[in-house]
Amino acid sequence: MPICEGPQVLRRNGDLFIVYSASGSWTADYCLGLLHNPNGDVLNPAAWRKHGPVFKKTHQVWGVGHCSFVKSLCQTEDWIIYHSKSKREPGWEDRDVHAKRFAWGSDGFPDFGAPLPRVAPIEPPAHSRPRTVPMAA
């Protein structure tokens, strides 16, 4: 039985997207799919177009899914926050949370690129300030 879960809304320039997780979250094949509604009639099932997978495993990262979207403090960058696995084997013990900047294609669709490996450095968001987060004792 197919599994689709964790829908997240993404809007840009009047376009409406729903990004969702597909497959079992414990598997290497967990990925993100995308629904696009080009005409705004959200209650009409025929108005939605399905695309996917739009963010999926690589040879270093597996089980990519369950995301959220945020903007940088200056509102100029779009970021995706997502889970991934560092091993191919089924299970949840190797699941991590990652953040990555993403772009928009010339077609108006989000372009998430490839998921980052566990140890990949990332540039901080634009106009972010270094912060110290106190750790609980």
Please provide the spans of the model-predicted regions.
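Carbohydrate-active catalytic/glycan-binding domains of CAZyme proteins
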Residues: M1-A137
